[in-house]
Amino acid sequence: MEILDVYDIKGNKLDKTTVRGNLQLKEGEEFIKIVTVWFRSGIRYLIQLVSKQKGSEYAVTGGHVPTGSTSREQAKVECREELGFDLDDDKLKFIGSVVETRVIIDVYLYEDEDIDLEEVEFNLQEEEVESVVWLTKDEMEDMILKGILRDSTAHQYMVYIKDM
């Protein structure tokens, strides 16, 4: 059972928690936090194919922020768990938040020009991630048009990544 802190629309933590899978939130007033991490090396971004159990869709790395954790801390946890990749804190940059139905998504950019796209190896968590692919912005926009990029990932792309 995963316990999550509850936040107001501005991202301020309220004196309340809820249980993942059984969210008890006042619509439009209370939210949980999710974190996502966009990896960029040169002109390419890392997108993962989420496992079949999780919906078989393309998305960025991320997850729920549990009680007592910050989104920055959880960004590191999610990357370690899902990709087997330890983030260098100096290269992890908060770029903003997106508010969606019942969630506030804290969006981070991990930029590392030294990643060799042909050589980097990820140790994927099979329950979460089927595979990963490095894409250009044009390739992501094509996926958005085809409807094969998770809606929240497409939303983050349009708000923060497209014009970078």
Each predicted region: which residue ranges?
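Acidic, metal-coordinating catalytic segment for phosphate/diphosphate chemistry
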Residues: 1-36
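Short loop segments at secondary-structure junctions
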Residues: 10, 41-44, 51, 111-116, ...
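Short hydrophobic alpha-helix segments
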Residues: 17-18, 49, 98
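A short local loop/turn or secondary-structure capping micro-motif enriched for an aromatic residue
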Residues: 22-25, 54-58, 152
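A glycine-rich, hydrophobic loop/mini-helix early in the fold
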Residues: 32-64
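Unchanged
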Residues: 63-149
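Charged phosphate-binding loop/patch that engages nucleotide di/tri-phosphates or the phosphate backbone
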Residues: 150-164
